[in-house]
A protein has these predicted regions:
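Serine residues within intrinsically disordered or low-complexity segments
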Residues: 13-19
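Intrinsic-disorder/low-complexity regions
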Residues: 14, 24, 175-177
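Short, basic, low-complexity termini and linkers enriched in Ser/Thr/Gly/Pro
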Residues: 23-31
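Residues lining hydrophobic/aromatic ligand-binding pockets adjacent to catalytic sites
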Residues: 31-178
C-alpha cells in the first residue's frame, strides 16, 4: 500500500494555524511512516510496523477498492480476494474513521468460511481461530473500529507494537514518498 514518509513536526510549535496534528515528540528530525488502516494487512505492512515510527492515519480519505476494506488470502485454489462491504463508499473526502460497515450482504459469513476452509488444517488454527472468530460474528458500526480491533489482535499475536494513531488527516508535504 501507499506509504508516505516525512520528518515529524516538533512539538510546541507556535504556529496555531497549522493544519497538522503533532504526532511525535522527537528531539531531532526522524522519518515516520504514515500507513493507511488496512483490513487484514499484508506482510509488507508488518515490516513497516516492525521498523517502528509508524502512524496509522484515521483521518485520511477512504479510497475504494483498496487495502482499507480489501484483503488477499491464499486459498487452496490460489489467491482469494475478500471485500468488507461499506456504506456510502462513493462519498467524496470521507475520512476512514467515518466509514460505516454494510451488513446487507453476508460478507462476514463468507470471509470466515474462506478463512476456515483455507487454514483449518494449519498447525495451531484452533488456537488462533478463537481470537479472530468474534470479528466475523459481531456487527461493528465503523470500518476503522473493525480494522483497529483486528490489527490489535494481529500485533499482539505477532509480538509487534501497535502503531501510533492520528485522527487528523496528515497532509502530504513536498518530498513525501507515496
Amino acid at each position: 500500500g501507499p506509504v508516505r514518509c516525512r520528518p515529524p513536526e516538533r512539538r510546541g510549535s507556535s504556529d496555531s494555524t497549522a493544519s497538522f496534528q503533532v504526532i511525535f515528540n522527537f528531539e531531532f528530525l526522524l522519518m515516520s511512516t504514515i500507513l493507511p488502516l488496512a483490513y487484514l494487512p499484508s506482510v509488507e505492512y508488518f515490516t513497516h510496523l516492525l521498523r517502528g515510527g509508524c502512524v496509522v492515519d484515521l483521518g485520511e480519505h477512504f479510497v475504494k477498492r483498496s487495502e482499507r476494506n480489501r484483503a488477499r488470502i491464499l486459498a487452496s485454489d490460489g489467491v482469494m480476494e475478500l471485500t468488507v462491504h461499506v456504506r456510502n463508499a462513493n462519498r467524496p473526502r470521507q475520512p476512514v474513521r467515518d466509514v460505516r460497515l454494510d451488513y446487507s450482504k453476508r460478507w462476514q459469513h463468507q470471509h470466515w468460511g474462506a478463512l476456515v476452509a483455507s487454514y483449518r488444517s494449519s498447525p495451531y488454527f484452533d488456537f488462533y481461530a478463537g481470537r479472530f472468530e468474534p470479528f466475523y460474528r459481531r456487527e461493528w458500526e465503523f470500518l476503522a473500529d473493525y480494522n483497529l480491533g483486528l490489527l490489535e489482535v494481529l500485533c499482539s499475536l505477532a509480538g509487534v507494537p501497535m502503531p501510533e494513531l492520528s485522527r487528523t488527516y496528515v497532509e502530504a508535504a513536498p518530498g513525501d514518498l507515496d
